[in-house]
Amino acid sequence: MSRLTSAHADRRRISSTLIAIGSARRCLPLFVSARPGTPLRVLCVMAFDALHQLRCSKPLPVATHRVLAALLDFGACTNAIFDGKEYSRKELELTRQILDDAGLHSIVEAVLRQLSDLEGRRPSPFGDDRRFHDTRSYREAVVRLWLGTLAATVAGNGWPAEGTRAPYGDDVLEILFRIVMQCQIIDDVLDYSRDASAGLPSFLTASASLAEAIERTHQASREYAHHRDLPRSDDVLPLRMALAVASICARLVILVRRWRSGSLKSATSPRTRLRSTAASG
């Protein structure tokens, strides 16, 4: 009996791995196309293609790949607007038109309303432990909103989702959520100087002390990496492996940031300059 169980588990692991490889092969053209704009967004499309095949036993249509790519680029533009960063108005209008043509007008409108509400309550940087918690919750809410939107988009091809509801109850999407959060941590660590200068909320700008922010971010990364409450089924093996890789990368980036902050302490840090400017004002 144990041999049969082991053989069945091996088949499921092999099957899930082949599905992941197939999704990567189908999405390869996206790496050299104009859309989506970054390799990380291509990997996101790959993940949803693989998840769809796991659930529905068939890959996503190529047309849906293009819609997901447009949605990811549209999200990047809207986030840049809320952050006060440069963005392409032409790109924003073009991606919005693609989404409207795909029948996603109502979903996009709902997302923009929810996103406006979240951004209207975004926490300010450089606070206490409570501020870090609020910033983390804000970051998580934005990620869950966009993941829910992507899931709702895939729902038009057989995925049972409900509108733009965030994927709280879906164990498989929870793994993807944690992968994205690890990537968010990596991005926040790498963009610390720019975020601090601009006064943007992030994992590293949330706390008044950079050292405390690094430690709290490290703890958050460990929590996202924890697999105790994640599904252990063999069909999600590729996702669990991806989470492990993202977690290792996040930990390494945090360790490097900790080392740099310890060896390069000076009064010219973006955090210090921002405080000095506020005091002189």
Predicted feature locations:
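Generic alpha-helical secondary structure signal
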Residues: 12, 58-62, 93, 166-170, ...
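Structured alpha-helical bundle/scaffold domains in large eukaryotic membrane-trafficking regulators
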Residues: 86-89, 194-197, 201, 236, ...
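Catalytic cores of phosphodiester-bond-cleaving enzymes
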Residues: 217-281
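Active-site/pore-lining binding-face segments in mid-to-C-terminal subdomains
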Residues: 169-231
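Conserved N-terminal diphosphate/IPP-binding helix and adjacent helical/loop segment
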Residues: 1-73, 77-81, 108-117, 121-132, ...
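Hydrophobic, Leu/Ile/Phe/Ala-enriched alpha-helical segments that form helix-helix packing faces
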Residues: 18, 95-103, 220-231
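All-alpha helical catalytic cores of prenyl diphosphate-utilizing isoprenoid enzymes
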Residues: 34-49, 64-67, 84-196, 248-252
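Short, charged, amphipathic alpha-helical segments
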Residues: 88-89, 93, 204, 235-243
